[in-house]
Amino acid sequence: MLLTVTHRLLPDQWAVLAGTSALWGVVSLVAGRRLGERTVHGAAAGLTAMVGVLIPWLAIHAASTPPAELALWMIVGPVAGAICGAAGAMSRMPGRRGALAAGVVPGIVGGEAVYGLLLIGGPAWGLESVLAAGLLVVVSRRGGRLCAFGSAAVLVALAAAACLVYDSIL
């Protein structure tokens, strides 16, 4: 609900930040990181957090969004929430596994920012890229930053490609 209020309060060129699905993943990352002592608990926390973001969005946008897009988000949203929550829980782990997980959500956010910068334009996408970089620094551990940066770079490319596919389908 907070995202919807934010979307309405921000000027048009910034309002996109309240409705970007990648930034919704940050909510799931935080839930998974804070509540997930094990990966499965992080996945459950992330899924729950994403459903909490998704239900108000679906309720508010049901009349103005094509049914195919609503169905897509009802399927993809909870799965993405579980993945982001699991990545949050795993990012707390020591070693390479935790470092690789730390790059997942920042990479997704960065990929969406690249897509927005290249195809949509506007200042919000530049800010989202800065948020992705900042999130990567905060989530990654000093000793494993190179692994985290590597996984984030791969996810940037994959997320940007997924955004392109999404646009071509809907």
Regions found by a protein language model. Give the residues of each.
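Juxtamembrane boundary at the C-terminal end of a transmembrane helix
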Residues: 159-170
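Structural signature of hydrophobic alpha-helical transmembrane segments
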Residues: 10-23, 66-78, 119-130
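Central hydrophobic cores of alpha-helical transmembrane segments
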Residues: 43-52, 101-109, 147-160
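Membrane-proximal helix-loop-helix units in multi-pass membrane proteins
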Residues: 55-120
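Alpha-helical membrane segments in multi-pass integral membrane proteins
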Residues: 98-142, 151-155
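Cytoplasmic membrane-interface segments at the C-terminal ends of transmembrane helices
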Residues: 29-42, 84-101, 136-150
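Alpha-helical transmembrane segments and their membrane-interface exit regions
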Residues: 25-27, 53-54, 77-84, 130-139, ...
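N-terminal topogenic module of multi-pass integral membrane proteins
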Residues: 1-58, 62
